[in-house]
């Protein structure tokens, strides 16, 4: 998982998942609090990554350090309650090897809900570390490109300390300045962010 200044909440997350994991990898992107000291209670695999306003870059680095067959990617402000811990354990025992991505239900606590994120939604959270390519048609050697996705019944509780719109807008601006445009997904996400938390300057 990737973290920054999560000392106040990291134990809450790791206590809920640590015994479900075969390895725990922490990538710190510049904490100035005791985040790494808290993490050290759970693992000695703690790494530094210079933050560059790119969550994908940090996530990709964390994935590159993994050794197990599957990678679970929680954030520090997420937890699994006891019922969903049991579901996660059952998933580990029954997971078919052809499954490449497991989606889990994602629910944000009401304090930080808005009309736009009040509903529980599926998010990809568990990933096969090494993808195996295979042919799917009897002629012309067509390779399956679409991953095999399983929608599980596991529900993650998202308990943020605050809204992150200032940070997120900064990343949007950097991405636009770097690429000169947004991908279709980022356009959609930016529009949603504007509706939730934007002000006059953001719409200008």
Where are these regions (language model features)?
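Short, well-formed alpha-helical segments that are part of the catalytic scaffolds
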Residues: 1-20
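Acidic helix N-cap motif at the loop->helix transition within catalytic regions
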Residues: 8-11, 33-42, 83
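A conserved acidic beta->alpha catalytic loop
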Residues: 16, 28-38, 51, 75
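Conserved beta-strand positions in the Rossmann-like core of class I SAM-dependent methyltransferases
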Residues: 25-28, 47
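Conserved donor nucleotide-binding strand/loop of the catalytic core
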Residues: 37-61, 65
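Catalytic-site signature of metal-activated, phosphate-bearing donor transferases
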Residues: 57-63, 69, 74, 80-203
